[in-house]
């Protein structure tokens, strides 16, 4: 069975494939008993484990059931988390919440919010042969038809992610003389890359990674904090679903960093991939083409609900382009009209430079796919990384090619990707600093751009995962 997770997440110290299962077998600490402690492990035909002592006595060893958080804290393969993910974060869970709302007494319902990514919207637009704006309106119509209360666009949250990434880079560039780990800055929006970095390279790589939250998790802050306040609700009274182009986003939403201890709720309760939304449509017997469009929802009255918006710089969010333009202007007073990409090893590794009088002032790169990520990390370890900033994504070709996107059976992969890029770029673009509602929220919700509150709600932290010494680390 092929894993839907990104290549970076399928890495493991085992050479054989561990298929997903409900009960992952994890080493369990057993209290030492007096004696020599010499024993053998016998594996039965049914897969159960027995300890065989020297005197011939046998003892069945424990089989530990692990949660998704256990899997995230493990240093090995994460494919065994797949079934847990599918049961905890699936369209069936959304159905349960919607059904519970129908049965609930007045005032006991949870407010259901769905936030849709631009990449998922482009994928569904391609499948149903619609333009992105019609797709957004018809998706709003569909979700409200099945009981969802509000449908938002995560592009609004991406404004904050981009702005925080811009500010962080400029700050770290200015600090590079005082810190060896200030540069390069590595983008943080891809959870597959983050999970791989934490598990495989740990404390070496983590200081380089941007602390800016991804658009999904900024949306989590917006919905469970700002929007909850607007609706006079506590965060646990809102059920927040995101629609994303990859399965790795389920792992991101499940991180303890994005869990509200006071209200015992996650910023994002459920992540659906584009494919899961398509299955939901099929199960409801609905085609997007047949639905009447509905008005789009805006998080604030100043956010346009007429049409969706996006950003320049490609289908992975435009991190390189926005940080590059801002840094050129802020650090060197240079206005960049067009960003020119120079392909290097392959189309997924490209470079951008800012030069003045023959001197390179800034050198940025995009590194998509695990092969290029490995090369980047090796350069860093050898002290030969020439870049100031790198937009890193685990999926080859970036987020439009995420593992949760719809595949076209009659279309070549490259042809479908070109179609998605065209649809993605059809949407109106805006600079994040000029987006309606953004500055208003910085002042009134976050209490200023550089406030402690802005840092807490728009940034995160990373955790190196220690590799335990166990039999599971044996290479076969």
From Swiss-Prot:
PANTHER family in UniProt: NITRATE, FORMATE, IRON DEHYDROGENASE (PTHR11615)
Binding site for [4Fe-4S] cluster 2: 190, 246, 395, 399
List of residues that carry N-acetylalanine: 2
Nucleus is among the record's keywords: no
Name of the protein in its database record: Cytosolic iron-sulfur assembly component 3
GO biological process, one term: hematopoietic progenitor cell differentiation
InterPro entries (UniProt xref): Cytosolic_Fe-S_CAF (IPR050340), Fe_hydrogenase (IPR009016), Fe_hydrogenase_lsu_C (IPR004108), Fe_hydrogenase_ssu (IPR003149)
SMART domains the record matches: Fe_hyd_SSU (SM00902)
One Gene Ontology term, aspect cellular component: cytosolic [4Fe-4S] assembly targeting complex
Region (Disordered): 297-316
Similarity section: Belongs to the NARF family.
Oligomer and partners: External component of the CIA complex. In the CIA complex, interacts directly with CIAO1 and MMS19.
Keyword DNA repair: no
Underlying gene: Ciao3
Organism superkingdom: Eukaryota
